Swiss-Prot record:
Species assigned in the record: Arabidopsis thaliana (Mouse-ear cress)
Functional note: May be involved in both secretory and endocytic intracellular trafficking in the endosomal/prevacuolar compartments.
Keyword field: Acetylation, Endosome, Host-virus interaction, Membrane, Transmembrane, Transmembrane helix, Transport
Pfam families attached to this UniProt entry: PRA1 (PF03208)
Membrane topology reported for the UniProt record: Multi-pass membrane protein
Protein name listed in UniProt: PRA1 family protein D
InterPro entries: Prenylated_rab_accept_PRA1 (IPR004895)
Domain of life: Eukaryota
Coiled-coil segments on the chain, per record: none
Gene this protein is translated from: PRA1D
UniProt keyword annotation of Transmembrane present: yes
């Protein structure tokens, strides 16, 4: 049983860190420049937050962990809440069932958010954690606005119009589409 838990934690951790973009790309100083307009900055923030979302999450988690290092009870609560998130939300493949009732993932997320906030308030570090997360988000948005997006791979920057802009033809007859005559 314990071996299965450790294996599950390892696999999920490798999956999460494997999804992170290379740190060399994240910190590439030659990719930084001032945006030409507010619209350009907004586009950069949106694209960089999408592209580097795992990197940003890792940085915020480390900052939050370092903030709590002076309060041992807060660290224990942080670990317990982190494990609850891991086992009840991230590492589950089948729906959560309690006493024969299937619990929706949205309800699980709301309950875990409540547990997270409750543990921050109970341990007395909510203001410190809120300040750290606020500062971290500000720095990450600044990074996202200043880092250019020209060199990013567009595999996760899909057009919201999807296949409507396809030029492959795909059996369609140009602008007419795939209509049959009357």
């Amino acid at each position: 049983m314990a071996n299965q838990v450790i294996t599950g934690i390892k696999e999920t951790a490798q999956s999460i860190t494997g999804a992170a973009r290379p740190w060399g790309d994240f910190l590439d100083l030659s990719a930084f420049s001032f945006p030409s307009s507010i619209a350009d900055a907004t586009t950069r923030v949106t694209q960089n937050l999408t592209h580097f979302r795992i990197n940003y999450s890792i940085i915020l988690s480390i900052l939050l962990g370092l903030t709590l290092i002076t309060r041992p009870i807060a660290i224990l609560a942080f670990i317990a809440v982190g494990l609850a998130w891991f086992f009840l939300y991230f590492a589950r493949e089948e729906p959560l069932t309690i006493f024969g009732f299937t619990i929706d993932d949205g309800i699980v997320a709301v309950l875990l958010i409540g547990l997270s906030i409750g543990s921050l308030v109970t341990t007395g570090v909510w203001l410190r954690a809120l300040t750290t997360v606020g500062f971290g988000v500000l720095v990450l948005i600044l990074h996202a606005a200043l880092r250019g997006t020209d060199d990013l791979v567009s595999d996760d920057l899909e057009s919201p119009y999807g296949p409507m802009l396809s030029t492959s033809g795909g059996g369609n007859d140009g602008a007419r589409g795939d209509y049959s005559g009357i």
